[in-house]
Amino acid sequence: ADAAVAASAALAVTTPHMCGMGGDLFALVHAAPGPPDVLNAAGRAGSGADPDRLRAEGLRVMPFTGDVRAAPVPGCVDGWCALHERHGRLPLAEVLGPALRLATGGFPASPLLVATLPRLEGVEGCEELTSIRPRPGDRVVRPGVARMLAAVAEGGRDAFYRGEFGAALLAVGAGEYTDDDLAESGASWRPPVGRRVWGHDVWTPPPVSQGYLSVLGAAVAEAVAGADLPDPEGDGGAGAWAHLLVEAARLAGHDRPAMLHDGADGDALVSDDRVAAAAAGFSPDRRAEVRGLGAGGGTIHLCAVDAEGTGVSLIQSNASGYGSLVAVPGTGVLLHNRGVGFSLEPGHPAEYGPGRRPPHTLAPALVTRPDGSLHTVLGTMGGDSQPQIVLQLLARVLAAGESIGRAVRAPRWVLASGTGQGFDTWTAGEPIVRVEADAPAAWVEGLRRRGHEVTVASELDVAGFGHAHGITIDEDGTRIGEADPRAIVGAAIATA
């Protein structure tokens, strides 16, 4: 847990284009045989949230950027503190030390950071990023974020939410947030959602996470094909493999806008009845006729397993790149835009309103054996496509018997709308299937023959296919980790 918090904090410093202290966080923690604990650190809309006002302004959907109302109270720091309080061993100041040193002493700018910094042009209150024009490798310092980290290290969550950051958030919020919104931790521990699939127990966070789609999709694929899945790369079965999993994801996810909201029953969403109903729509020869309701994300996933076998699957996000493009002045912190998940339809179960949590794309996963021991921690960035990518990893590791390394490196597909936004797969009409350039030709031919609309990405286009990572623990305790080559990342083993 200490390693997960330390890595998450370091990424909050070095990858502001994907995550930060102004975002949200989920984690699955397996510390003893049995189901994992789930940490939900998704923030709630402020007390000033008023859907009628947005509708009166002529909005039919939530603002995406440039509007503080797109940002519920950030939950990330509450998540760090809650995870450390329950499972940490080292002092919090020591855990946050590496991130603080990166913020004060600087870190080399990555090519992706350099390429995305122009998106902040015109954003006020974040001069530590808007005033620099680094080249790849140039040193970047984050003095405002360093002060915020130092406050958390010394005084915990209250020093952040009730200190300089909190005061500045109330000011920039202009009535969207109140003192009471910041008084209590927004993080809570919850039981997971899960079911047995391919001989293992697959776990994800409950709603508001969309993680149930990974479990439901895997269960649908198993119900249709059992454990004997087609060969994902062979000419004879590759098209059937791709069709099976694409359809499992579509049949599981097409009604997500109506089903996923704060307070939704996660167990009911992966029930036997739901699995059977979805599986009944599958045909091996053609695309099912399912519809959503009509009309590039910024996230990181990390995982860690310690010497005692405690495993953490953690995901942290700004939602979209630099989030709402609203900075909390003087702090170096950019606010996320997770409020884009709310609905402005009157009476909708996910309607924007005070104290409500929006539906979340964040969907980490964890797998245990029937005896309750830890098998795999895994997850990915990728907006709406996260459960689809996790489904493909689960199918390869649990059903096809592949190593986590081969599964992570293997070609992928994702479902996507035509907008490229990454958060409207199920609300912008029938999604298309985007396939990586190195995928087997049989995938494309087999999917098109069955009625799917397919586009093939260019060789340089890997951004839309997630950055997945995982650690598998063999029965003898051997850890095998894989970091996605699509990202600038790594897997490491440390001894103390």
Segments the model singles out, each with a brief description of its role:
Residues 2-156, 160-162, 166-202, 206-209, ...:
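Noncatalytic scaffold domains of N-terminal-nucleophile
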Residues 9-40, 176-178, 310-376, 386-387, ...:
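Active-site rim segments in enzyme catalytic domains, especially the processed small/beta chain
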Residues 10-11, 19, 23-31, 300-305, ...:
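Short beta-strand scaffold segments in enzyme catalytic cores
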Residues 78-86, 154-168, 221-222, 380-405, ...:
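Alpha-helical support elements that line or immediately flank enzyme active sites
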Residues 148, 161-184, 262-284, 308, ...:
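Amphipathic alpha-helical
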Residues 189, 296-299, 360-362:
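Short, small/polar residue-rich loop motifs at catalytic or cofactor-binding pockets
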Residues 226-317, 331, 338, 458:
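Internal maturation/activation junctions in enzymes
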Residues 242, 253, 258, 262-267, ...:
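Extended C-terminal subregions enriched in glycine
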